[in-house]
């Protein structure tokens, strides 16, 4: 990222972006690895964060109730704590698998497990009322990954299945796109209709605008494929890359509203192939090392916590296809904190009973 700051088209913006990211990583990852040498600090971090999150959830649900739990008000009722419902739901998804694990972990007292059950229920209600489709998809994928661990399905079979799915998509992509374009169901408070609207790429303004941003990021990458335009520059540079036929009621000619809506495409535009590959390789490394830690950890509590953390991160890895929040403190704190916990458990706690 530092290298692409030097070659940036807006050096001041890029160095500012670099310093803010460096602050997140230094504070929540590097210092976190030192803090989590003491296993009790891992629990303190999780519980203290969740206690504050529960207060925000209570505030959000109370405000949402004043607007009859409408889908439109769900977008902003969590402000000023979160900018919108997507970041709010993403954080809930990070912690939800951990507390489900607490319910079934007999290392905890009955009281703690009961409290974890009620917190899980609150998270479930909050997630439902957020009307955040990306978060729902993330949770669905995490559930699928859980069953892979539960039934000990071999990695080769999983990779073969994913490869076959990708191959079938490319073979039938024309028919698939024609089918998707016939879906005109917009977002709704009706759960079945809201889920159906996920695949609406024709009339749902949120979905179509997201595709517009993705296409802009890809066009920017094609113009500067190696080092990109510079960290943090997408928001200032994407406007000329919009095509009129792809614009929505949300779009602006100035291109002054938001980012690329993808943790994978944002660095592709900002830092070129190097930036995008760096994030993808980190995702692969986290999944691989966490899976190894889960398999070889001797202590059951370590195993359960590892699985909860991994599934929580997977919800964000999936969510990150459609949104990007790691440039904000709201997601950077739990994200880098989770990575610090996993690394610390792998290095210091995996071969002993805590």
What does each model-identified segment do?
Residues 69-79, 201-215, 219, 223, ...:
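Long extracytoplasmic/lumenal interhelical loops at the membrane interface
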Residues 266-284:
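Membrane-interface anchor segments at the N-terminal boundary of transmembrane helices
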Residues 7-16, 128-130, 321-326:
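Membrane-interface helix caps and helix-loop-helix hairpins in membrane proteins
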Residues 16-21, 81-95, 134, 260-263, ...:
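Membrane-interface micro-motifs in multi-pass membrane enzymes
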Residues 161, 279-282, 307-354:
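Transmembrane alpha-helices of multi-pass inner-membrane enzymes
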Residues 1-12, 18-19, 32, 168, ...:
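A structural signal for hydrophobic alpha-helical transmembrane segments in multi-pass membrane proteins
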Residues 1-6, 23-27, 41-74, 81-152, ...:
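Alpha-helical transmembrane segments of multi-pass inner-membrane proteins
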Residues 58, 64, 125, 129, ...:
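A membrane-periplasm/extracellular boundary helix in multi-pass inner-membrane enzymes
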């Amino acid at each position: 990222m530092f290298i692409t700051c030097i070659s940036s088209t807006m050096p001041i913006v890029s160095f500012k972006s670099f310093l803010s990211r460096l602050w997140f990583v230094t504070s929540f990852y590097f210092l976190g690895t030192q803090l989590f040498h003491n296993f009790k600090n891992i629990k303190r971090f999780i519980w203290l964060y969740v206690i504050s999150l529960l207060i925000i959830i209570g505030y959000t649900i109370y405000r949402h109730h004043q607007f009859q739990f409408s889908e439109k008000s769900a977008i902003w009722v969590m402000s000023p704590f979160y900018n919108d419902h997507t970041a709010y739901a993403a954080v809930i998804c990070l912690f939800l698998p951990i507390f489900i694990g607490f319910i079934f972990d007999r290392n905890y007292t009955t009281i703690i497990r009961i409290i974890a059950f009620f917190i899980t229920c609150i998270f479930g209600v909050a997630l439902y009322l957020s009307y955040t489709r990306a978060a729902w998809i993330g949770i669905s994928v995490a559930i699928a990954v859980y069953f892979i661990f539960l039934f000990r399905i071999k990695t080769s079979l999983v990779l073969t299945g994913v490869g076959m799915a990708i191959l079938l998509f490319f073979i039938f992509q024309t028919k698939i796109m024609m089918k998707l374009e016939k879906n005109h169901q917009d977002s709704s408070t009706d759960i079945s209709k809201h889920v159906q609207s996920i695949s609406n790429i024709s009339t749902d303004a949120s979905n179509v605008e997201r595709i517009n941003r993705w296409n802009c990021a890809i066009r920017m990458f094609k113009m500067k494929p190696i080092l990109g335009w510079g960290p943090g520059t997408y928001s200032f540079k994407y406007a000329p890359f919009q095509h009129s036929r792809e614009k929505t009621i949300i779009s602006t000619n100035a291109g002054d509203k938001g980012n690329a809506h993808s943790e994978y495409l944002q660095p592709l535009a900002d830092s070129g192939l190097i930036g995008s590959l760096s994030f993808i390789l980190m995702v692969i490394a986290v999944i691989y090392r966490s899976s190894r830690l889960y398999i070889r950890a001797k202590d059951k509590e370590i195993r359960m916590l590892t699985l909860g953390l991994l599934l929580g991160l997977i919800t964000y890895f999936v969510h990150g296809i459609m949104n990007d929040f790691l440039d904000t403190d709201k997601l950077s704190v739990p994200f880098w904190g989770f990575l610090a916990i996993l690394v610390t458990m792998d290095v210091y706690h995996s071969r002993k009973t805590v």
